[in-house]
Design a protein with these regions (language model features):
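C-terminal regulatory domains involved in ligand/effector binding and gene-expression control
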Residues: 1-88, 93-305
Length: 305
């Protein structure tokens, strides 16, 4: 199985969640072994920012990368789409300090990347294989990665709220591109009305609305269309985790389990794994059949020499 990038450059304009201003976003193909990198198109001569867990300096409400004094925030939904589609090498140019929020899910990014198409590259795709269980814990919240032949994500939330059904606070995803697209990519972020009002008083979440989030008051979901899934809240937490985990630098072979985890704990887990080389191995596969993860069929990808 080989690395992949996109076939052609593509662009879109969205709204910044916190600024409320238009944000231009561009995706560009990259050579083998480049990885995922961000670049601020609004800052002349700004250095590229690698998608690395060690550059996460702020996890308040989202995962935010800072490198050389330059910031790119709210990267997790986009990284989730990139991970879900198995993209290894990509340049992301953004005209502001945050990735546009789009509809609050990863689905618009998935659509954009599919529109750009994919190219297989002449280098083996590298996976990080978890070989020892690693767990991080803060109070009653925890997250772990364990050895597993494939990639599975299990997540449990615990909200005591009448609008968040107790029967739908746990979810599991057996990762494949198809499962990601169908079961996870369209799950939206959510927020409580009281928190949004407080953020706006501090000039934050100015772009937040029911067009890009599930909004909940003290008793009800305020969006007229309701939920996309009965368990959309916990599905979105898995979506977030998938993006946060991709900051490890490779697709993962392992089982992710979490209870009430968030961006900070997800980042702590990745750093803990990378802190000890005996926790993992970097592996490759000779072909798609031997790889335990199913990505998009190669017949939908243009092979590039």
């Amino acid at each position: 199985m080989n690395q992949r990038t996109i076939k052609t450059a593509i662009a879109v304009t969205g709204t910044g969640l916190h600024s409320g201003q238009p944000v231009d976003l561009e995706f560009h193909p990259q050579p083998i072994n480049t990885g995922i990198i961000f670049e601020r198109s609004d800052i002349a001569g700004s250095e590229p920012i690698p998608a690395s867990a060690f550059l996460v300096q702020d996890t308040m409400m989202s995962s935010n990368l800072v490198f050389g004094g330059t910031r790119v925030g709210t990267v997790e939904h986009l990284l989730s789409a990139i991970a879900g589609l198995g993209v290894d090498n990509l340049l992301i140019r953004v005209s502001a300090s945050e990735i546009p929020i789009m509809d609050g899910s990863a689905a618009p990014f998935v659509g954009l990347l599919l529109q750009a198409g994919f190219c297989e590259q002449e280098a083996a795709k590298r996976f990080i294989k978890i070989v020892r269980p690693v767990r991080v814990k803060v109070d009653d919240k925890w997250a772990e990665l364990r050895p597993y032949d494939g990639f599975e994500l299990n997540f449990e939330i615990d909200f005591d709220h009448p609008a968040i059904n107790k029967d739908f606070q746990h979810a599991q995803l057996q990762f494949s591109t198809q499962n990601f697209i169908e079961q996870l990519s369209s799950a939206r972020t959510f927020g409580f009305l009281r928190d949004i009002e407080a953020l706006r008083q501090n000039n934050l979440a100015l772009g937040g609305s029911m067009d890009n989030a599930i909004v909940i008051d003290d008793a009800n979901i305020l969006n007229e269309e309701g939920l996309r899934f009965n368990d959309e809240f916990v599905r979105h937490k898995i979506l977030d985790a998938l993006g946060d985990l991709y900051l490890i630098g490779y697709p993962i072979l392992g089982r992710f389990n979490a209870y009430k985890s968030g961006h900070a704990l997800n980042n702590m887990l990745v750093r803990e794994i990378l802190s000890d080389p005996s926790n993992f191995e970097i592996v490759t596969f000779d072909d798609n059949v031997s790889c335990p993860i199913e990505y998009l069929p190669l017949n939908r990808i243009t092979v590039e020499g």
